[in-house]
Swiss-Prot record:
Protein name in the entry: S-ribosylhomocysteine lyase
Needed cofactors: Fe cation
Family, per entry: Belongs to the LuxS family.
Keyword list, A-Z: Autoinducer synthesis, Iron, Lyase, Metal-binding, Quorum sensing
One protein family per Pfam: LuxS
Lineage, uppermost ranks: Bacteria, Pseudomonadati, Pseudomonadota, Gammaproteobacteria, Vibrionales
Gene Ontology biological process terms from the UniProt entry: quorum sensing
Binding site for Fe cation: 54, 58, 128
GO MF term list: iron ion binding; S-ribosylhomocysteine lyase activity
Amino acid sequence: MPLLDSFTVDHTRMEAPAVRVAKKMQTPKGDTITVFDLRFTAPNKDILSEKGIHTLEHLYAGFMRNHLNGTDVEIIDISPMGCRTGFYMSLIGTPVEQTVANAWIASMEDVLNVEDQNKIPELNEYQCGTYTMHSLEEAKAIATAILAAGIQVNKNDDLALPESMLKELSVD
């Protein structure tokens, strides 16, 4: 099985909260797609609650689009990581990490301004696969923690696992 880019970096050295450019690729038409690792919690140390991350999934995707989309950037998707330590964001364009961090901060402030669980978009059985698994309170606690901690930048060069270690860890 091919080794995915996200598994070539040392998760034990990742800072959180932090932004990292996980991958860049070119489309056949020449557009650049950038995938960002938006790490909310330190891997293997903390985990986002099920209800909190699910509620953030509904809120964060819209708020990030409000703050980041523009003439040179269009968000394709923001999805929670299976490990529940953050989100992956794929977009067309190449915004710098600090621009993404600023949009993330503004989005967390927006989460804190949501007044009622009934204001969570697509919170119904027709548009959500587990519409009863939400907590605005838990989402706000996550947002508060992000704002209190601030957002750093993780660089792939600083986190790259040595080739020898990748071979040693490989499951054939």
